[in-house]
UniProtKB/Swiss-Prot annotation:
Keywords annotated in UniProt: 4Fe-4S, Iron, Iron-sulfur, Lyase, Metal-binding, S-adenosyl-L-methionine
Manner of cofactor binding, per the entry note: Binds 1 [4Fe-4S] cluster. The cluster is coordinated with 3 cysteines and an exchangeable S-adenosyl-L-methionine.
Main function: Catalyzes the radical-mediated synthesis of 7,8-didemethyl-8-hydroxy-5-deazariboflavin from 5-amino-5-(4-hydroxybenzyl)-6-(D-ribitylimino)-5,6-dihydrouracil.
Protein name listed in UniProt: 7,8-didemethyl-8-hydroxy-5-deazariboflavin synthase
Superkingdom as given in the UniProt entry: Archaea
Top-tier EC class: lyase
The protein's required cofactors: [4Fe-4S] cluster
Binding site residues for [4Fe-4S] cluster: C15, C19, C22
Matching Gene3D superfamilies: Aldolase class I (3.20.20.70)
Disulfide bonds listed in the record: none
Gene encoding the protein: cofG
Amino acid sequence: MTYSKNVFVPVTNICRNRCGYCGFRREPGQPGARLMKPEEILPVLENGAKAGCTEALFTFGEYAEEVSEYRKWLKKLGYSSTLEYLLFLCEASIDIGILPHTNAGIMTRTELKALKPLNASMGLMLESTATLDAHKDCPGKLPELRLNTIREAGKLQIPYTTGLLIGIGEIREDRIESLEAIAGLHREYGHIQEVIIQNFAPKPGTPMENFPAPSIEEIIDTICLARQILPSDIAVQVAPNLIDPKALIAKGVTDLGGISPLTIDWINPEAEWPDIKELQRKLSPILLKERLPIYPQYVRKKWYSDRIGGLIEQLSDTDGYRKKP
């Protein structure tokens, strides 16, 4: 059972999408709306490196530049685009000794190509191939746009994370279709390292706050479907702060994602990360094994640039897992 140790950096929560279930997004002027400054981010990265974290998870609202106030904030920091700022943050992270993993919504091939040399892996939740009410005000949640980003990442040989969000109005057939779409892209490009099966958790103050959470039976069924449909070299992941993983391991879960000893889950701030030692005790006799944000098979295949190669080699053992510090 693998996991990575990360720091979670929510660079901005300004977003052009208005998902019915999202508690992360803010409008400029709302309490908590922000674009994090370098002086806020760099200490998080430095503390993460000291704590033995290997992954900097950079998250963004999607195409925040469509919001004029955000563009002003960015200009004030001295950057002309989100991409330019993100490239700076990735460079800083590498220099500090933490591997970047960027999740910033849909991206063009040009953006992916610019970020590839500075990221150990990247990610985008597919969520669902279905057209859902939850996404009615979300230009970036059109399934074909998301699948295209995942496809372009494959063409560029970027180790990639994607996943399904369960319980947002989709039906079982939609989940099957979503898993088949991911499997098809992986068979073509070989770049999907993990698929997250994430359970929807209702957030107060959102349009879907009274929507029922999916049952454990639905989650188990989806994990079983994932294991049947996805190629065997793709890890199936659940978040241990959102669901108890113990009963799910027998169904095919092989990874617990990024767990942070320092930062909260900014997307699900009500859900605390488990303590890694406590998690190991609960999961015994199954052993937890730490990995990097790039999975061992991609470390061994050297799917990374020279810019991050030295750091990956420094942090990984001969099998491509995290070297014991």
